[in-house]
Amino acid sequence: MPYPRKRFGQHWLKDPAVHEAILRAAQLNDLERGADPTWVLEIGPGTGQLTRRLLAQGVQVVAVEIDRDLCRLLRKRFADQPRFHLVEGDFLRLPLPPQPRLLVANIPYNLTGSILEKVLGSPAQPVRQFERIVLLVQKELAERLQAGPGSKAYGALSLRTQYLADCELICRVPPTAFKPAPKVESAVIRLTPRPAPTPVRDPCWFNHLLRQGFSTRRKKLVNALGSLVEREVVAAALAQLRLNPDARAEELDLPHWLALSDLLLEKAPKRAVVPQEEQEPG
């Protein structure tokens, strides 16, 4: 069996209880099935431990793997499985396969942000292909994704993710569940993309406002957003929303951020210009 490669951020998940937790979180039986079996996308199948369990559920598995040695192992291991479809390559450089509506993955932690953006999209361009996304991620990131107002983990990433999907922490995973053991704790999360995110007048402006608001999170919003909109305009918008005039970015929930975005766009349209690099998801 190939040894985990550091350059690919590989850590084999060896705890069968965590594999079972991922399967339960995927809720395969709850997906609406037509005449054909459900298609599942697995990013980074590794040695195929989770793949084997998925195939046992009767689903079609599209597995994307970048490691050539692992691809050879997987082809040999699942040679007699007509429902196993291997794609060799870098997931971030490949188009999304059109069939899967469920995604599961134990992914390199340094690529989690880029992978999330690819499978969820952005406020301006949501991806609505998947009914459910189950990921094994660093515990710190899991806490950020599901964090609420007032917590240290709450930030622009929390709001962008929650705008696009419901996020649940399924279970925590200790380093001992992997080989080799990583230096951090992990967690299984389930993302349920929203079929139609809450309308906002200008999603690019909303995204830009979040970045600016949380770039100096200890500042009051009237100051943090001062480079975009006059302080008096921000203060008036907060008052209209019946929010604390001294509020900081971390104190507003998602509905208030959406409302604030629309109000500031309306009150200061000439200043509400989004930098070109933020107009499209990267």
UniProtKB/Swiss-Prot annotation:
S-adenosyl-L-methionine binds at H11, L13, G44, E65, D90, N106. It holds the Pfam family RrnaAD. It is found in: Cytoplasm. Its EC number is 2.1.1.182. The keyword Oxidoreductase does not apply. Specifically dimethylates two adjacent adenosines (A1518 and A1519) in the loop of a conserved hairpin near the 3'-end of 16S rRNA in the 30S particle. May play a critical role in biogenesis of 30S subunits. This is Ribosomal RNA small subunit methyltransferase A. It comes from Synechococcus sp. (strain JA-2-3B'a(2-13)). The gene is rsmA.
